[in-house]
């Protein structure tokens, strides 16, 4: 039984028990489709009958309204059923949050009940020959013709290609450069299978996501009514961004269940595999590898549901959802590699799930935003957090004769604000932080003046060759550091000298 967290509601705990039982009952059937290399339509229908495709859809539209936590609970378990989990995630995320946030009431009433029932599978179509991680570089076009839109272009690496009935696509509706700079050149649409000119071009043989068709789509003068447009014209980028936190979260959650399964598999295997006259679970190396996998599973799972709780509370955890997607994918790949190592030659065969785990994890590091994109998001949004950007003040402490972190004011605070004293502030920073520049605010706070006056004086110092200024592309002063000439003018050379007590006087020069 999967461990429920203390903050789960009784309904969430009930759903967790129910879906785990469902998966256990149908696990053998999922294995059969894996070996037959067939798309598991009967299993998909069972999932639909249980209503699980409606996990994240409001009850008013026929869904279960389980929120982010409930959706992760379902994804965690269905991910154990090989291709079923990926089909569930992609179909549920094929415009769900976008429709909820941008569609008209009429559109919601038309599309959401179908999604909730699982009558139709869905796919998300962003990637193109021209657009991968650079998702804004879409070249597929949509031109207005009366009450219709005419779509031309191609999409590729579309999970669920061919088996899906509805395709949530993003197309370029403006060639204006100013629109492109403002990300106002895209519009989102729903395109149904069967539209004239809309065809499946190719299926990709991926290293993972077994039996889930992934392919190329071709649009050749495909006509759709304006009622299939989701959101305003030119707001496709905003529509795309809507619900990304939820999507990354669930895309990570679908891998959690297989991590637990591999732990069970390894305990089972190593208890029964004997080498050097003892079971292999007694070897410290194997114990360490399994301990690593257990740690990754428990840390990844708990962080996933913490992030889900944040979303259910109305927050937008951009950083945490990116972390979830990134670490779960990496954990799965690493766990697969470790499991293979523990199982030896058996781990290399398809008779055991270790090799599949490694392959699935590698795909997970690419789809739904690469690991590198997640890291970029984590860094960029973290760089905006005040808590991470509080300056660290290093002050020279005479008692210990060393720079230490301190909240006390600068020794230069209150001096007359002029070139001489400002140069001393900047030169003194060389003694404390020899490899670093100072910001305008660092200098301003140390001497006690305004930003404008600080900029004015450092410009004058620059003209005299006493400081080096690093500017932005727009020419704004960003960072300042004393030049060698500035250091000499500010203080005598002895001011900058520092030697540990053990250093011999005779060796100085």
Q: Language model features by range: what are they?
A:
Residues 462-472:
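A short, conserved structural fragment
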Residues 484-509:
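Short, amphipathic alpha-helical interaction segments positioned at domain boundaries
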Residues 137, 194-225:
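Flexible, small-/acidic-enriched active-site or ligand-binding loops
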Residues 1-81, 85, 90, 102-107, ...:
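Alpha-helical interface subdomain recognition
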Residues 432-446:
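Short acidic, hydrophobic short linear motifs in intrinsically disordered regions
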Residues 403-425:
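Short alpha-helical segments that sit at the start of domains
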């Amino acid at each position: 039984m999967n461990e429920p967290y203390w903050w789960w509601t009784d309904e969430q705990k009930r759903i967790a028990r129910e879906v785990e039982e469902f998966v256990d009952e149908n696990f053998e059937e999922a294995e059969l489709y894996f070996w037959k290399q067939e798309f598991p339509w009967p299993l998909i229908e069972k999932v639909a009958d249980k209503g699980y495709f409606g996990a994240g859809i409001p009850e008013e539209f026929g869904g279960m309204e389980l929120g982010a936590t409930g959706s992760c609970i379902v994804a965690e378990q269905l991910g154990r059923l090989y291709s079923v989990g990926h089909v569930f995630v992609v179909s549920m995320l094929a415009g769900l949050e976008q429709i909820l946030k941008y569609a008209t009431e009429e559109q919601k009433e038309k599309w959401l009940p179908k999604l909730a029932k699982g009558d139709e599978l869905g796919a998300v179509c962003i990637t193109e020959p021209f657009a991968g991680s650079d998702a804004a570089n879409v070249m597929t076009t949509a031109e207005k013709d009366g009450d219709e839109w005419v779509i031309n272009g191609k999409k590729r690496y579309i999970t669920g290609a061919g088996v899906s009935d509805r395709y949530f696509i993003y197309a370029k509706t403006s060639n204006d450069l100013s629109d492109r700079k403002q990300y106002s050149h895209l519009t989102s649409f729903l395109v149904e299978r069967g539209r004239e000119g809309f065809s499946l071009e190719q299926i990709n043989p991926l290293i993972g996501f077994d039996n889930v068709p992934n392919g190329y789509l071709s649009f050749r003068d495909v006509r759709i009514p304006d009622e299939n447009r989701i959101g305003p014209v030119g707001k496709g980028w905003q529509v795309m961004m809507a619900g990304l936190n939820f999507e990354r979260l669930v895309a990570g959650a679908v891998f959690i269940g297989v991590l637990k399964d591999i732990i069970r598999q390894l305990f089972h295997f190593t208890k029964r595999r004997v080498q050097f006259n003892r079971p292999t679970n007694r070897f410290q190396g194997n114990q360490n590898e399994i301990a690593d996998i257990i740690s990754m599973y428990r840390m990844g799972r708990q962080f996933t549901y913490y992030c889900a709780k944040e979303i259910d509370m109305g927050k937008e955890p951009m950083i945490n959802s990116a972390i979830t997607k990134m670490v779960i994918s990496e954990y799965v790949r690493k766990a697969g590699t470790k499991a293979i190592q523990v199982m030896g030659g058996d781990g290399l065969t398809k008779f055991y799930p270790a090799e599949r785990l490694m392959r699935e994890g590698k795909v997970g590091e690419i789809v739904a935003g690469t690991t590198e994109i997640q890291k970029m998001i984590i860094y960029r949004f973290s760089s905006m957090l005040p808590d991470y950007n509080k300056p660290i003040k290093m002050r020279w402490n005479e008692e210990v004769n060393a720079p230490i972190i301190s909240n006390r004011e600068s020794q230069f605070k209150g001096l007359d604000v002029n070139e001489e004293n400002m140069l001393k502030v900047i030169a003194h920073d060389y003694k404390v932080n020899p490899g670093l520049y100072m910001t305008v605010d660092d200098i301003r706070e140390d001497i006690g003046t305004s930003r404008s006056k600080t900029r004015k004086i450092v410009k004058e110092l620059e003209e005299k060759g006493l400081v080096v200024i690093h500017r932005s592309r727009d020419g704004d002063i960003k960072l300042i550091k004393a030049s060698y000439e500035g250091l000499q003018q500010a203080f005598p050379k002895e001011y900058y000298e520092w030697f540990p007590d053990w250093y011999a006087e005779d060796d100085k020069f």
